[in-house]
UniProtKB/Swiss-Prot annotation:
This is Electroneutral sodium bicarbonate exchanger 1. It is a multi-pass membrane protein. One of its GO terms (biological process) is bicarbonate transport. It catalyses: 2 hydrogencarbonate(out) + chloride(in) + Na(+)(out) = 2 hydrogencarbonate(in) + chloride(out) + Na(+)(in). Residues 500-507, 587-595, 709-731, 800-824, 903-904, 984-1092 are cytoplasmic. It is found in: Cell membrane; Apical cell membrane; Basolateral cell membrane; Cytoplasmic vesicle, Secretory vesicle, Synaptic vesicle membrane. It comes from the Eukaryota. SUPFAM superfamilies: Phoshotransferase/anion transport protein (SSF55804). It comes from Rattus norvegicus (Rat). Residues 243-255 have a biased composition (Basic and acidic residues). Induction: Up-regulated in the brain in response to chronic metabolic acidosis.
Length: 1092
């Protein structure tokens, strides 16, 4: 078409006959039958493919400045020879190269790709009713069909297409109208422009035009518009509000629109080019539930196919609107339409049109074609996108697969980035460099060489995030985490205090443990570098306290004073470690050490939970082999002890109890226990009369807590109830379980053992206060001698704290606010010194509680397409949950009336749940299960691809041996050296370099997530296969792109193929019989349909 010709506004001038000349079997039609000379066509091609053209446009018509040479007739000089070379070369451009060239072009505001929602509508005829467009399928990521009954959507599934329908779609784009960047504001205007274009391509009578226009303007019926005879829809449209421009995403979740005054147009709305003027949208018909799944800024792609009785051959049009327009009633959800594909044909081929429509809708959801559709400048670009799609498809044999079977969406969809990346001359594909395997390298662990240099960097790193640590806690998930972990932390703190009270004769007991945990936890949550870590008591600390108390008792030293000296020295040594950046040594702690330590702690939790349940049999024994015939002879009564011990005699003396005058047989159980009486009789146990059913009821509570907690936690992935309900139940899983078990225990009434919380805030012993003198009655030299045990204690604190911190700061947790190893250790050191002066227990990072805390705060994508698995986004990093846990723990003294109803077996069940759940994802246990598994049944673990199985077993055996040694030391009187053994694991790992290669250790001993490493491995393997099959030409020209990658330009020096196995699907497709048949049909008389 001459440059000076006038076109209807919205029809682009790119549809010149020269650009319509698709290299195929001559099936391309022209607009005005204007024939260009071969030289001109060749020159045009040479200019387009040989030079990277900018996307800047003189006008919306998209004319490119070709210069005078483009308009010359005749002249077989230099320009013509270049044109011939370009034409010959362009025929050999692979679709992949062409697509990479298209995607490498500059972007402008009108061609920025958005997320797409695609809808397939078909003309539906009902008896006695007027024909209308009916929604039959939709795509956000996967396909959803309206079931035959028409009452519901199908489950999302992976769309399977026939190759024939894809060929037919390609033929449609070759022979139909392609209107890019049409400017229109209504469906009426779009219909007129399409029909105007059709009249240029073919003879279209007025009657046919009227019928087709009527068909295009018919009402659209969507699946969500069910019968509402009993409902009065509240029709609220943009027109009624004042026809003001408003973004469709300015709706709230109840369907109310935000007024233009309260929601001014944002830069995003202007950038998206949404034109909502004169587009009344009935929000009462919008599917607001489905709207939540559509990302903000998404646009629509409408596919309209159907039969019109007045047509003798199909009308095909592909339209891209610029800007996107909000068309009332066209789409199921009120979002602007960017693309339309229209296929109207003669009656009798409805199923064929349906499959072509499905193919168009499916290909629009393809990540690569989606971008090509946004950036395409002409028909050839769209065809290149389809050819590239065909080049990547996987074919299922017809005799081995039933197409009616719906394929479930995969859990992980492979990345398509590789398809976007250009080839390089040696045949390799440019790819992003993988992240380094394993290790903890990062700025947090770099030695600065300055005094407190690491601490200063930690403070600078965490300070900008401090206030966001409180704002980010405004979530229901944080409330669930706080309630769950409060219950989980209370029991071990009280239990630890009770054990410590027994070991120290009450000098440090439950009330001191509660107070110390609360004070230390609050300070740590407020000022630590990684507030996700939960502080708690550890077994080695208890062993250290027992040994120290025994030493002080043997040498008549004051236990609390000597302990205060040791604590102050330990705090000082930890501060020295902070000053010298000793935390940088954490980089030597690899997965080998982490997993051994974490596995041990998890096993200890599981073991102690079961052990505590079994110990209930001592207090509540089972009366086995009961002789029911002698049941009437059983009795248990209180009596005066025959041989009272000194403690009992002292009690009687202090309370002036006349033992001879007491009627012991008439005392109740509680009165007998209070007066230190003795139970005698065949129905008595060690601690009083037999209490029936307590042990069995405790076992029921224990296992029920574990099973219900595990079930509710996985409820998020179940098929029942809406997403919000499932997420809430999953977040509150443990708290709901504890609450349910408490109610059940209260209703059953069996006297199970309950949580005992101190009810008075004062020291356990009257002979001590809240401040302990470091010297006290001890000799002065004890202050200096205390540095010796303090060295061992420092190693204990450092290893416990930093190994837990390393586990929490793993890369797979995707933490964004950084970590602070030096700052964490400083806060722990200061609070350790404070607790020592106050006579309170020492607290360090608790591994299992910290892992459980992190797991309870996992973030997943909320806006996920139907069928798409939510993506793990990271952890909700904040300080409030830890702060509230320890604040409420300090207030527990005043909540005794409520806490006394919590059965201890329920808390033991929570311990079991935390231990088992924390084991998930530990590679060591996955490798341990391989021992009893035949090779053909072994999972596709990434390390099994690269490391021989015998080496994997050897690595696991070494790790298992170390774990057993740690367990033996932990359970023996030598438990005080446990931190030294954990430190020894680092050296064991170093020795393993002699038995394993670096490559094997990189796969077996690192911190990289499994899914990510497997993705890189699959990409690398596919790259090697492609390298073996394809060899790209070395002489291709290259253009520097914004991404700083090299892109081979289509159309120059690409005609020579070194590898005869390399094919160009665009060249090979016309050679197929199927394509020849389609081409012959499309070239026949106009009376015939091209879809025979």
């Amino acid at each position: 078409m001459p440059a000076g010709s006038n076109e209807p506004d919205g029809v682009l001038s790119y549809q010149r006959p020269d650009e319509e000349a698709v290299v195929d079997q001559g099936g391309t039609s022209t607009i005005l039958n204007i024939h260009y000379e071969k030289e001109e066509l060749e020159g045009h091609r040479t200019l387009y493919v040989g030079v990277r053209m900018p996307l800047g446009r003189q006008s919306h018509r998209h004319h490119r400045t070709h210069g005078q040479k483009h308009r010359r007739r005749g002249g077989r000089g230099k320009g013509a020879s270049q044109g011939e070379e370009g034409l010959e070369a362009s025929a050999h451009d692979t679709p992949s190269q062409r697509v990479q060239f298209i995607l490498g072009t500059e972007e402008d505001e009108e061609h920025v790709p958005h997320e797409l929602f695609t809808e397939l509508d078909e003309i539906c005829m009902k008896e006695g009713e007027e024909a209308e467009w009916k929604e039959t399928a939709r795509w956000l990521k996967f396909e959803e069909d309206v079931e035959d009954g028409g009452e519901r959507w199908s489950k999302p599934y992976v769309a399977t297409l026939s190759l024939h329908s894809l060929f037919e779609l390609r033929s449609c784009l070759i022979n139909g109208s392609v209107l890019l960047d049409m400017r229109a504001s209504s469906i009426e205007e779009i219909s007129d422009l399409i029909l105007d274009q059709q009249e240029l391509l073919r003879d279209l009578s007025d009657s046919v035009r009227v019928k087709v226009r009527e068909a295009l303007l018919k009402k659209h019926h969507h699946q969500n518009e069910k019968k509402r005879n009993n409902l009065i829809p509240i029709v609220r449209s943009f027109a009624e509000v004042g026809k003001k421009q408003s973004d469709p995403h300015s709706m709230d979740r109840d369907g109310q629109t935000v007024s233009p005054q309260s929601a001014p147009a944002t830069n995003l709305e202007v950038k998206n080019g949404v034109n909502c003027e004169h587009s009344p949208v009935d929000l009462s018909k919008a599917d607001l539930h489905f709207m939540k799944k559509i990302p903000a800024g998404a646009e629509a792609s409408n596919v309209l196919v159907g039969e019109v009785d007045t047509l003798d051959r199909p009308i095909v049009a592909f339209v891209r609107l610029s800007p996107a327009v909000l068309l009332s009633g066209l789409t199921e959800v009120p979002i602007p339409t960017r693309f339309l594909f229209i296929l109207l044909g003669p009656v009798g081929k409805g199923q064929q049109y349906h499959e072509i429509g499905r193919s168009m809708a499916t290909i629009m959801t393809d990540e690569i074609f989606h971008d090509v559709a946004y950036k395409a400048k002409e028909r050839d670009d769209l065809l290149a996108g389809i050819d590239e799609f065909l080049d990547q498809v996987t074919v299922l044999p017809p005799g081995e697969w039933d197409p009616s079977i719906r394929i479930e969406p995969p859990k992980n969809v492979p990345s398509q980035e590789k398809r976007k990346m250009p080839g390089v001359p040696n045949g390799n594909i440019c790819h992003v460099e993988p992240e380094p395997h394993g290790g903890h390298s990062g700025p947090e662990l770099e030695r600065t060489g300055r005094l407190f240099g690491g601490l200063v960097l930690d403070v600078k790193r965490k300070a900008p995030w401090y206030w966001s640590d409180y704002r980010d806690a405004l979530s229901l998930q944080c409330l669930a985490s706080f309630l769950f972990l409060y219950c989980a932390c209370m029991s071990p703190v009280i239990t630890f205090g009770g054990l410590l009270g027994e070991a120290t004769e009450g000098r440090i007991s439950a009330i001191e443990s509660l107070f110390g945990a609360s004070m230390t936890g609050i300070a740590y949550s407020l000022f630590a570098g990684q507030p996700l870590t939960i502080l708690g008591s550890t077994g080695p600390v208890l062993v250290f306290e027992k040994i120290l108390f025994k030493f002080c008792k043997d040498y008549a030293l004051s236990y609390l004073s000597l302990r205060a000296c040791i604590g102050l020295w330990t705090a000082f040594l930890c501060i020295v470690l902070v000053a010298t950046d000793a935390s940088s040594l954490v980089c030597y702690i690899t997965r080998f050490t982490e997993e051994a330590f974490a596995s041990l702690i998890c096993i200890i939790f599981i073991y102690e939970a079961i052990e505590k349940l079994i110990h209930l049999a001592e207090t509540y024994p089972i009366h086995m082999h009961s002789q029911l015939d002698h049941l009437s002879l059983y009795y248990c009564r209180c009596a005066l002890p025959e041989n009272p011990n000194n403690h009992t005699l002292q009690y009687w003396k202090e309370h002036s109890i006349p033992t001879a005058d007491v009627n012991w047989a008439n005392l109740t159980v509680s009165e007998c226990q209070e007066m230190h009486g003795e139970f005698i009789g065949s129905a008595c146990g060690h601690h009083g009369p037999y209490t029936p059913d307590v042990l069995f009821w405790s076992c029921i509570l224990f296992f029920a807590t574990f099973i219900v907690s595990s079930t509710l936690k996985t409820f998020k992935t179940s098929r029942y109830f809406p997403t919000r309900v499932r997420s809430t139940v999953s977040d509150f899983a443990v708290f709901l379980t504890i609450f349910t078990m408490v109610i059940l225990d209260f209703l059953i009434g069996v006297p199970s053992p309950k949580l005992q919380v101190p009810s008075v805030f004062k020291p356990t012993r009257d002979d001590r206060g809240w401040f302990i003198s470091p010297i006290g009655p001890n000799p002065w030299w004890t202050v200096i001698a205390a540095i010796i045990p303090a060295l061992l204690c420092t190693i204990l604190i450092f290893m416990d704290q930093q190994i837990t911190a390393v586990i929490i700061n793993r890369k797979e947790h995707k933490l964004k606010k950084g970590c602070g190893y030096h700052l964490d250790l400083l806060v722990v050191a200061i609070m350790l010194g404070v607790c020592s002066l106050m006579g309170l227990p020492w607290f360090v990072a608790a591994t299992v509680l910290s892992i459980t805390h992190v797991n309870s705060l996992k973030l997943e994508s909320e806006c996920s397409a139907p069928g798409e698995q939510p993506k793990f986004l990271g952890i909700r990093e904040q300080r409030v949950t830890g702060l509230m846990i320890f604040v409420l723990m300090g207030c527990s003294v005043f909540m005794t009336a409520v806490l006394k109803f919590i059965p201890m077996p329920v808390l033991y069940g929570v311990f079991l749940y935390m231990g088992v759940s924390s084991l998930q994802g530990i590679q060591f246990f996955d490798r341990l299960k391989l021992f009893g598994m035949p090779a053909k049944h072994q999972p596709d673990f990434i390390y099994l691809r690269h490391v021989p199985l015998r080496k994997v077993h050897l690595f696991t055996l070494v790790q298992l041996t170390c774990l057993v040694l740690l367990w033996v030391i932990k359970a023996s009187p030598a438990a005080i050296v446990f931190p030294m053994m954990v430190l020894a694991l680092v050296f064991v790992r170093k020795v393993m370099d002699l038995c394993f290669s670096k490559r094997e250790l990189s796969w077996l001993d690192d911190l990289m997530p499994e899914s990510k490493k497997k993705k890189l491995d699959d990409a690398k393997k596919k790259e090697e296969e492609e390298e073996a099959e394809k060899m790209l030409d070395i002489g291709g020209d290259k253009f520097p792109l914004e991404s700083r990658k090299l892109l081979s330009s289509p159309g120059k020096n690409n005609s020579f193929r070194c590898d005869p196995s390399e094919i160009n699907i665009s060249d090979e497709m016309p050679k197929t019989t199927v394509w020849k048949a389609l081409s012959i049909n499309s070239g026949n008389t106009k009376e015939k349909s091209p879809f025979n």
